[in-house]
Amino acid sequence: MSKAVGDLGLVGLAVMGQNLILNAADHGFTVVAYNRTQSKVDRFLANEAKGKSIIGATSIEDLVAKLKKPRKIMLLIKAGAPVDTLIKELVPHLDKGDIIIDGGNSHFPDTNRRYEELTKQGILFVGSGVSGGEDGARFGPSLMPGGSAEAWPHIKNIFQSIAAKSNGEPCCEWVGPAGSGHYVKMVHNGIEYGDMQLICEAYDIMKRIGRFTDKEISEVFDKWNTGVLDSFLIEITRDILKFDDVDGKPLVEKIMDTAGQKGTGKWTAINALDLGMPVTLIGEAVFARCLSAIKDERKRASKLLAGPTVPKDAIHDREQFVYDLEQALYASKIISYAQGFMLIREAARSYGWKLNNPAIALMWRGGCIIRSVFLAEITKAYRDDPDLENLLFNEFFASAVTKAQSGWRRTIALAATYGIPTPAFSTALAFYDGYRSERLPANLLQAQRDYFGAHTFRILPECASAHLPVDKDIHINWTGHGGNISSSTYQA
């Protein structure tokens, strides 16, 4: 019988799995590696894992037998049906109190279901977001675990040891119950979509209106990366824009302008609609990728549909132009994160989760794709007030957006004048203006709904009267002259 020496079992030896195993071994943990294809295990042990505290398993039974109790088994395999299949194979060999960790990109409703099913069987289940890509897995990812709280004391040391560190603090903390870990990872990915789209719009404005070369744009991003916009995505954009092909021309300009997506941004946008949250920037970022995908249609439209042209002298003050653009990017980024945390807040309320908001912001400060110095202020905001309703109610962020507002508006106006699409910048500003409006035209919208569908409406308290009572659903015959008013409970 195999000796139980493993601290962690890991199933799935694609690059992410291998790198996470090597990371754990570097931190003094003994890892048992398993893959359905035995040759992958053998190759890994003979090469990258050679000489490290990594042992192989030849079967599910062998994997389980080599792990210390309570057994901790992490899955880094394709999301969906393969996870369910593997869990079914694992469970008969486990004891109550053993721990299964799904580290893949699972959709949170699936994690909720697995959590419920395994809890009934006495198995502790953790759904953990893992961000940072291949390098993150190897040298320190952002980890977002949630699920069975009883599992946390058993996996905390491993997770916080292998996680990225920000100012000495691990970018890993317990998120909350059920599928909350994967939910937070989903929102992280949605914010990532938004950040990337904002950066692309800034690039497009500099290129098409400012007529900057790629090298000049790279220099702008390099400068921005020393200030409030310092982040991983700004850093890699700088590097991409100065990368030349073998002919000396920028490689980025040779890439087809059709962006792919794996679906996590779409999940975030759909969930925002389900919960009634105006997470507009992530939604526009998803739609921007969809628009990019219809390349042939866009080519035909470019020959048929007229629009303004950009004159050579569109920009008279390049320094002011770049400053305004920086302010637009910064303010829009604040809106994106404010919307993301609004969604997390509403999810906690709707799903009955108690979430650790300060820890969520901290987890994103290092190791992950959206890591940035900006997140330090979000962490501080939620540490100062864990129940903060919206980031825009925090003094730092309210002041930052107010200061950036003029440049933000000028940038969007300039882009609109010359026909440059800015869906993310524009929706961020539209949200800001809507959010700060005490009164919106939804009064007319609700009257329209009542006119054609008897959907009823409510009266403003200061406008209440005997025939228009407050706190009542009211329907009116709009084809008359103010008569035929009746209360109704009809809703649609």
UniProtKB/Swiss-Prot annotation:
Cited SUPFAM superfamilies: 6-phosphogluconate dehydrogenase C-terminal domain-like (SSF48179), NAD(P)-binding Rossmann-fold domains (SSF51735)
PROSITE patterns: 6PGD
Pfam families (UniProt xref): 6PGD (PF00393), NAD_binding_2 (PF03446)
Keyword Oxidoreductase among UniProt keywords: yes
Binding site residues for NADP(+): 12-17, 35-37, 77-79, 105
GO molecular function: NADP binding; phosphogluconate dehydrogenase (decarboxylating) activity
Principal EC category: oxidoreductase
Binding positions (substrate): 105, 131-133, 188-189, 193, 262, 289, 449, 455
InterPro entries: 6-PGluconate_DH-like_C_sf, 6PGD_dom2, 6PGDH_C, 6PGDH_Gnd/GntZ, 6PGDH_NADP-bd, 6PGdom_BS, NAD(P)-bd_dom_sf, Pgluconate_DH
Quaternary structure, from the entry: Homodimer.
Other comment: Present with 556 molecules/cell in log phase SD medium.
NCBIfam families: gnd (TIGR00873), PRK09287.1 (NF006765)
Name of the protein in question: 6-phosphogluconate dehydrogenase, decarboxylating 2
Native source organism of the sequence: Saccharomyces cerevisiae (strain ATCC 204508 / S288c) (Baker's yeast)
Organism lineage: Eukaryota, Fungi, Dikarya, Ascomycota, Saccharomycotina
Gene name of this polypeptide: GND2
